[in-house]
Amino acid sequence: MKVSVIIPALNEEESLPGLLAAIPEEAVNEVIVVDNGSTDRTAVVAQHCGARVVSENFRGYGAACWAGFKATQGEILVFMDGDESFFPVEISKLTAPIIQGEADLVLGSRTLRAEDVQAVPLHARLGNRLVGGLIGVASHVWPTDMGPFRAVRREILERLDMEERTYGWPSEMIIKASKLRCKILEVPVSYRPRTGGKSKVSGNFLGSLKASYCMLKVVARWSLWTPAPPSSSRP
């Protein structure tokens, strides 16, 4: 199965070289960096490092993910941040359950292992717990982490009819996938503070607060969502 990695990036020229160099070629077929209105050399650096660059000028995490999704034809889509806080060598941990037919959506959790939890700031952990609990009430899926490192079948993402264009994208994906009765799996992933640049969410209290508020609104909005029946061709 063709695996495509989509990396939304806003002013990540410092982190991208190390991140892109660490992506295992044997596990990935293509890498797309979505330049989300950067004011630095993000696009130039990404292209120089061999990634395909897509531009999305509407600043928003979901908007960047959507632009990357539309630009690729991969059968498995992996989303990860461009700040080197996650480890590309673990991409196969996310894609393997999908390839083996064990899952449709695999979430990378930074809080399943005690050794990784402390790398996540307290305010981010508290926000994760609150949002994850409300998602559990709404969808009967109880995620331990709302992190962005995840893999999903393309055919599933197409059916989710994603609408959120900001930080609500990860929450919307989980809620809708659960209502489609998708097989959702969490796997532990390693995490570290960003290596360069400025944190927009987890490493920034105001960013975490803003993201959590956005996710809470998303839970309220999509908790009653009903999936459309799959289209069928007429005889």
Language-model features, listed with the residues they occupy:
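Short, acidic, metal-binding catalytic loop of nucleotide-sugar glycosyltransferases
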Residues: 21-29
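Catalytic donor-sugar/metal-binding loop of nucleotide-sugar-dependent glycosyltransferases
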Residues: 141, 165, 174-192
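Cell-envelope/extracellular polymer assembly enzymes that use nucleotide-activated donors
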Residues: 2-4, 30, 172
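Active-site acidic Asp-centered loop
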Residues: 36, 80-82
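Acceptor/aglycone-binding surface of glycosyltransferases and processive sugar-polymer synthases
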Residues: 57-59, 63-71, 89-167, 194-216, ...
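Active-site beta-to-alpha loop of glycosyltransferases that engages the nucleotide-sugar donor
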Residues: 7-18, 37
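A conserved acidic beta->alpha catalytic loop
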Residues: 35-43
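Short aromatic/hydrophobic "clamp" motif used to bind/position activated sugar donors
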Residues: 77
